[in-house]
Amino acid sequence: GIQTTKANSLTTGRIYKAVIDKERRGDYLGKTIQVVPHITDEIKRNVKSLGQKYHYDFVITEIGGTIGDIESAPFMEAIRQLKWELGKNAINIHLTYVPYLRAAGELKTKPTQHSVKELQSVGIQPDVLILRTEKHLEEPVLKKVASFCNVDLDCVIQSEDLPSIYEVPINMQNQGLDTAILRKMGEPIGEKPSLGPWRAFLERRNNAKDTVNIGLVGKYDLQDAYKSIRESLSHAGTYNDRKVNITFINSEYLTDDNVAEKLEGQDGILICPGFGQRGIEGKIVAAHYCRTHNIPTFGICLGMQMMVIEFARNVLGYADANSREMDEKTPHNVID
């Protein structure tokens, strides 16, 4: 794999801060700071320097948001300039949505057409289109999109809903996305990779023999808040031939009275990280119940801290044990 660093994640805040710091140092010799060229140049510098510093063969840059948003305007201009400067060494791939109207049984390509027109209006012509859809798109639909969006037919790729995100690369390869990208960039097209290890991973994932139930004790209801933890558990399950069933348990509503009911049927508990006072007592309750009932428990960051505090309170006898973050005046500061 590739070891990523903070250089691999770029935010608007970091861009603006870098430009302001340069202005304060006098790098711009007193010139008026503007979105174009100063902000756009900083965006381009970061994208280019990533490839130059780490000697990557390809730099894949994802621009978040929706075309037409005010916030993304400087990034769109930077991408337009990059394409002009790099020529065939850069291509633009546009991800767009093709909704399916169930009541009418009809697929709508208008949102995609308008999205591409918005891109074209700022000087960007997509080289490849990825169409997100919940229903398989037949060739007439793909031809229509290619024609109206001025894109080669073999560069219109559909990304339909699949049981697992890990099946997407196989689906993309089967449609020739890798070949289309190499052709557009003028790179030699070699033998089609077998993706053997990836297919073996999918085989194990889809044919797990047993099931394990893991409870996530946390306080953030948004599913993506613990995305990396969920995926890590899923990966671990795959390599142990287990399907992992994950149950979210909100620590904010976890008490001594309901903890047995909430944690019932779990083979293991993971106490999640977080910030602030909200929900920490529920995590301590969960840690206590798991320890006294021999349930395998894994605490990450704040979760681990709550396990230490629970042990200090209930085993060492420090009833007021806490962390300095939660209580600066605690006489028994077990987490500093």
Residue ranges and their predicted role:
Residues 1-245, 251-268, 275-276, 282-289, ...:
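Flexible phosphate-sensing "switch/lid" loops adjacent to ATP/NTP-binding sites
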Residues 262, 268-336:
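Cysteine-nucleophile active-site neighborhood
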